[in-house]
Amino acid sequence: MTPRPYRLTFTPGALRELERLDAFIRRKVFSEIERLADNPRPHGVEKLETKDKLYRVHVGPGKNYRVVYEIRDENLLVLVVRVGDRKEVYRRLS
């Protein structure tokens, strides 16, 4: 297995949100999060207009879930900030 270009890390809040998902959905969402380590700017990624350095990608069954993350190119790091349903994920973004 070849090493991935970027390292994935999660905020404590993002980990809690991921753990709260149904097991089936969590597996689907996590497998798509893992792909961000290979390409943090995949097709369909969008930069959030209101927050500097934050991106979002649609994931999971029906693409109804969002992963909000920061890309730190200088450290080759993807920091997952929020994970959740598209209706809830943008609340309380700091």
Please place each PLM-identified region on the residue numbering.
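Enriched for short, Lys/Arg-rich terminal
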Residues: 1-7, 12, 16, 20, ...
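A short, surface-exposed loop/turn module that caps and links secondary-structure elements
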Residues: 34-60
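Short amphipathic alpha-helical/adjacent loop interface patches that line ligand
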Residues: 18, 22, 33, 52
